[in-house]
Each structure stands twice: as C-alpha cells, then as structure tokens.
Amino acid sequence: MIAPACRPFVRAALLPVAFASVLAAPALAAPDMNKVVREVFPAAETGFDPAAVHDLYSGTLIQGIFETLYTYDYLARPSKVVPLAADGMPQITDNGRTWTVKLKKGIRFADDPVFGGKPRELTADDYVYSIKRLIDPRIRSPWAFLVEGKLVGLDEVAEQAKKSGRFDYDRKVPGIEAVDRHTIRFRLKETDYNLPYILAHEPTSAVAREVIEKYGESDGRALANPVGTGPYRLAKWVRSSKISLEANPHYRGFTWNFASADPADAALVREMKGKAMPQVGRVEISIIEEDQARLLAFQGDEIDLMNMEGPLAPKVLDGGTLKPELQAKGVKLSRIVDPDLSYTYWNMTDPVVGGLAKEKVALRRAMAMSYNVADEIRVIRNGQAIEARYPIPPGVVGHDPAWKSGIAYDPAGANALLDRFGYKRGADGWRTLPDGKPLVVRLSSRPDTLGRQQDELWKKSLDAIGVRMDVHKDKFPELIKAEKQCKLQMRVASWIADYPDGDNFMQLLYGPNTNQSNNACARIPEFDRLYARTQKMPPGPERDKLYQEMTRVIEAYAPWRLMISRYRNMLVQPHVLGYKRHPILHAHWQYLDVAPRGPNK
C-alpha cells in the first residue's frame, strides 16, 4: 500500500536527508541528441499551461518541461517526496502553519525571445506568481481547489479580481511571499497535511510571468509556447498528432543514484547507477487513438514505450506476464495496479438525471445497479482491472479493502426501483419520466475502441431496465472542456492520483470544486459538510471514519457508479534502460537511457 511520504510531515518534521540530495548532483555530460525515446499517447494533449490543463497526457508533458518545488523519488516505494527545484525540505514552524522553502540557485529557464537574449534565472517570485495563477478567476483553473481557503489572504485577492475583472499579481499576499530571491514563505490558515504533495504536483510548476504575458490568450491561459526549467523543451508540436521534445541545454542535470528495496530492481540499478542524467536527448510522442494501431507500431519498433490497454491483453499477456514470443525479443513489462479510479458520473445539475429529489436519486441508483462491472473487467478490460468498491483506490492512504458497497449489480432491483418512483414503461417498452415525458439519457464518449465498447455495455445495461440511451461522440480535449462547464449529462471518467492520499479522490465530489475536478457538478450538503471536517485532520482512523460516512452518502445519492482500478502494463523495448512504472510520476524520460541497437533498428 502506497503510504504518503509526508503523512507525519508536520509532526515528525523532515524526511530523511538522503532523499533530499537524490536530485541535487550536477550533471557530468550533456544529453546525447542521438538517444531518442518514442512514446505513444492514446488521447490528445490539451496544451502546456500548468494552471489550465487537467488531463493525464498534458500533465505528463508538463512534468517534463516545467519543475515543481518537490517531486518523488524514482524508485522508493511507498512514494517519497524529495526536493526538485527546492534546496532541501521545507522549514516548518508555527505548529505547521508556516513553511519556508529555499530554492536552488542558478536554475535557468530555457531560452526564449521574450527574455531578450539574456539568461533568465528561476526565482521565488516565479513560484509566487505561478501559484497565484491557480486562483485567478479569469483563468478558471481546474486546480483552484489546491489553494482555495488555504493560504492567508489569497482568497481575498481572488474575490477582488471577480469584482474588478483583473487579478492583482503585484499585491502582497501574506500566505505566499518571496522573502528574497531564493526563499518562499507559505502561511496557512490551518495546518495542511497535503501541502508537500501539492508542491510536488505539476499545476504548481514555475512559469515565467513575461512568458505568460507574451503568449497568453485573452482568458489568461498560455496553452502553447511552454518555457520551463525542466529537462526538456518543446521542439515541435502538431496538435493532436505529434509532440517532439528536446533536451533543455540549460538544465542542471543530476546523477542517477536511486536505491530500491525491491530485489527485482537490482539489474535496473546496476545498469543506471552513477550515470549523468538526462541521457536521452529527444522524446518523440505520437497520438494514436486506436488500440490495434498502437500495438502494431510497438511490434514494428516504431515506438519504445506503450501502455497496453485491456483490449490488447490477450495478444500480449498470459495472465500477468508477457507472452513467450515477446520475452524472447527482450521486451520488458512494468506492471502495477494504478492508483486510479474509473467511474461513470451523472451531471447533478441536469434536469433529467440531476438533483437531490427522491425520483432523481432513484433514477441514478437504478442506472448504477443496472451496470455489471464484472462484464467490463471480463469483456472490455480483458482482466486488466479490479473492481472499485470504494472511492479511494488501492495504494492510496484512506483506502478500505474490506468495504462492502451498497451499490451492487441488480437489474431486477433497478427495475423495481424505477417502477416504484413512477418511471412507467410505454407500449414500446421504454420508460417515461414520472410526468409522462420521454426518458432519454445521453452518454458522451471518445470515438475510439474503448469508447465504443463502453457505449455498448452501458446501452445493454440500460436497455435491460427500459431506459433509452443516446450516444454523443467527441474528441477527448472537447469532452474535457464540456464537462468542466457542466454540459455533459453522463460520461465514463478516470482519475489517477495526483498525490497518494485519499483527499485527492474525495475532493472529486466536493461542491465548491464544480468546474474544476467535480465532473458530476455535485453539491450534496451532507457530503460537503463531512469533507470540510476532513480538511482539519491528519491521515488516520478518525479521518478514515469520515471517509466511510462520505462513501455512504455517495452510495445514497449516486452521483457516480464506481467501476474499476486499472492495471498499468507498460511495454518497454529492450534497448530502453532504467524504466520502472511510478505510481505518481508520469514523465520518466529524464530517468532513462537508450542502449545501442542492432543494425536493422
């Protein structure tokens, strides 16, 4: 079980010093531009603005281009927070309400014309500016919840911006200030046990104000022209098709010096230990939506790293191991249960499926009861998932492995529930609303194999209870945009842990997070009240008890149908060295090397 690196952070002070130096050593050599890692994404990116994007694939790119104050040790399990741009772990005073962070000196942004040909050093002001952007009303950041209500004086600046139409970035905020060029001080309203995770999460990455002001759109977002301090910079971008990254020549680098307690990592450590990083000079990412096309590209040695989705499992795996023919070629498999959750949500503001009225609750519960998760795991995922019965997945602090869900597959019970609340069947077999109007629900999904399979299973499920379903297809970025505006009625969504704590999942239904991470646009007073109480608690039995109460509220009102947590099966070509799937980090290129390949490669 992945326990948080900083669960006792405030009370037990700092993490072991050994971890503080893992990423601090200077590089000994420049990356080799002839070393290329080719990867594939199954869905398109939405952009490169840390404050604006909200999808896994864009977030992965941001991790490679920008830098947060903290990150995670590459091999440590459970996940451990370590410094990245910070020069050591924070100094914590005032009973955990004041955090002081020192920056490493001499970190440079990648070159850009906006800097006028001069070197641009990373400073404390950059982090102050970047974190303020999360709460700027004009940007409408989906990550505002990370800082709302937490930093002294910051909410007041946001409220003033709502009235004036302009966020005053120059106004001093006691909760986040640059003490000097390389020192940041955070003052919290209450002790926040998740602050270390937030400062390791890519929305808090440093951007340069002059870059945002030069390239930003009218809404304050700068989805193109990323300029960061990370190991890579954007070299070429063909939207929704190809992304090319190249090594940032000003990146300071580090020495690969990670340790692992897992004997299975011994060979990996031997082949990588002591190398100047990054070794990889270029990263080429292709967007290939169809499962079979991705597999063919991997088999044809056109890509080096690929996450194998469930539909491909029979072609690649025997149980949980690679088929012998792939093993014979030297292909490697890195496999974990992702700290993620797939669920179907219903828009709680929608006039057909939303609301807290008893008949609306009955409709959602009946639809949830009609869906057989076992069929999804068997048919769609080919066994590459486990059923999710609790809203916090395995490997995340707060997960309850013994939980007995109150929502089970029960089509007979679902039909009885609809009958009881006035959803009558017409002569054609389809149900109507209690007022006699037609009942039609609309599922939104991606136009790929997985999306079509999910459409079919949901239609089969709803057909069995007499609920007519239409399907709306759109590209992934457009679906994300629409759901943030509460415009979708029903969709299958996934959330992978930003940090390994249950709060990261329970916040998905917190009312004030609507238009950010609350895709169901739910405002359930009982849930919100309980969630607010958890914000003042450290991880432990008392908070876990509240999470259990919150889970019963979710089951009672059914804004979601919990579905699965997925296995992540990363296929790795034999010439790629150093890869191990991390439960939280998604950008891994700076930790890899590429061995010489045969003459036909």
Provide a role label for each language-model segment.
Residues V36, F115, G153-D170:
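Surface-exposed intrinsically disordered loops and tails
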Residues A43-L61, V82-A85, P113-G116, P142-W143, ...:
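A structural "hinge/loop" feature
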Residues A25-A29:
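Sec/Tat signal peptide C-region and signal peptidase I cleavage site
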Residues A30, Y74-L75, P90, T98-T100, ...:
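Extracytoplasmic/periplasmic ligand-capture domains
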Residues I2-L15:
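Bacterial N-terminal signal peptides that target proteins for export
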Residues A12-A24:
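Bacterial N-terminal signal peptides
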Residues V40-D94, V227:
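N-terminal lobe/hinge region of extracytoplasmic solute-binding protein
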